[in-house]
Every structure is written in structure tokens, then in C-alpha cells.
């Protein structure tokens, strides 16, 4: 799964950062992702922490903050992720941060990049100055840095969300960060209404997992999923239930991240809260990649609920799109 959003900094922001690098006194440059999610633009240049706190207190969306202390020619690159900010925005900012840092350049940034969630805590940035020692850790690769950043955001989500799918006193990464929105218990739809096919999609605008289709599918051969974007599907065949995670080619990066980070939590919700035991968990790209033989009734030895862990993907079930080679020009 890609961990980059494709969003880049506007030239005006990069020019401002470069120009203010040699300025006297402290400089605080505030930036955010544009409403159309295509670029990062500068919103304000603050000259005091009081001004910074006032501006940040009015924001519900995350911010990027570049703080240059007096007497230092480097910025501290701060991620401000306010409590209560939308999940989609948090993930988008996490996946854009490293791209933005590369554009600004390592020569202009300190090795310390604080993550702050409360506007009042921004005043603590005054403790970051030229006297602070540089980090002694071995430099991380880009993928390692990106994964750490995403893990930070997911940890924040688990801390702030009221929905838990595992033990309430456990810090398990298998927690659900979205609320499941269903008028009836899902197991009741399967057991009482006779439906054996339920398809779910995530609505980031209100942070819920919703049922978009519930049907009776006579056989595996007639199973078909045709949705514009990722989805979770429960399919019941006889006494066996299957969970299908589909992420079609062309899905947006931010959607891929949201669905991937909530998959295990949703499976645990279905298992623990709805008492649905899955024989297999299948992950596919486009629906045409689904090997329907995987959805045949399985015996106890094959069932994931008898000795295997459904939270870990079965490698034999994973299928990926084969990259297409370049098209050759037809000779005439």
C-alpha cells in the first residue's frame, strides 16, 4: 500500500520558508492542506507564541507549523493534530508530511519534529532552541519514517475514540477508529432476515462504517461486488462465513489507508460483538481477482476459527494486480 498522498507544497510556501530562514527573531510559519487536497499552502506567519496559540485554537483541521527560534537557521517541523479533528484529515496529513519535508530540504529542518495535539501546548516550543542536542538515532529510511508517522496518528485515534473492539484496558492495535452505523445488529440481518451478503463502506465525513447493500445471493457463482472504491463484505455460504476486503485499482490513497487501518478492528468487532465466526479472510484488489473457490464451505481443519488467527492475512488468499507493460506502437 502506498503511504504517500501525492500532495505537494506550493512554491509560495517554499519561498517564504527560504526567505525567513535568515530573519531576525523567531519565525512561525503556519501551513495547511488546501480544501481540494492538492497542495500545502501558507496561511499565516506568526511572530509570537501567543499569536500562534490563538490561531491554532480556532482550527479544527490539522496544521503544519515551521518554528525557527532566534539565532538558529533551521526550522522545527511541527505537526499540530488537534483533538477531535476528522480521521480522514489526520491520515492525509500523516501521508503528506514526509513529502513536504523532502521539498523543504533536510538542511533547513531540525532532526526533531514534534507532534502536538493541544493548542495550549504549542507554547512549549519555546523550549526548542539551538542548545538542544541533535538526535543520536540511526537515520530511518523514508518508509520507516512514514510508518512511524502513520502509527502516531492511529495511536491518537485509538486514544480519542470511544469505540473499542477488544479489552477496554488493552492498547491493542486492533481497535476500530470508526463507529459502525446499522439499524439492526449485523448478526440479526444474517440469521433472522436470511441475508447472506452484506457489503460495507466507510463514510469519512461522519466517521462511520455503513451497510451499502444487503442481499440474498443464491450461490458463490452469482456473487458480485461492483462499487467505486474499497469495501468490506460478509458472505455466508452454508454454515461458513467469509470476510472479503476489496480495494480496487484506482482507489484513492487516503481511502486505501483508512480501510487498511480499520480492517482488523472491524473484523474483531464482528467476531467479538456480533459473534460472527469467519472461515476465511480474503483480500483482493479488483473483484475479477477473486478466486471463488476460496468461498466454498470449509472443514474444521481448513477453518481459520479452528487454530488459525483471522487477524493475520492468509498469504494464499492475497491477490494483486499484475502491472501492465508499456503498449507497443503498431507498425503500419
Swiss-Prot record:
Keyword match Repeat: yes
Gene Ontology cellular component list: actin filament; cytoplasm; mating projection tip
Gene Ontology terms for molecular function: actin filament binding; actin monomer binding; protein sequestering activity
Compositional bias annotation for Basic residues: 321-332
Phosphoserine PTM positions: 167, 172
Every ADF-H domain range: 5-132, 173-300
Alphabetical UniProt keywords: Actin-binding, Cytoplasm, Cytoskeleton, Phosphoprotein, Repeat
Pfam family, one: Cofilin_ADF
Localization (cell): Cytoplasm, Cytoskeleton
Record's function text: Actin-binding protein involved in motile and morphological processes. Inhibits actin polymerization, likely by sequestering G-actin. Prevents actin filament assembly by forming a 1:1 complex with actin monomers, and inhibits the nucleotide exchange reaction of actin monomers.
Subunit and interaction comment: Interacts with G-actin; ADP-actin form.
Family: Belongs to the actin-binding proteins ADF family. Twinfilin subfamily.
Protein name (record): Twinfilin-1
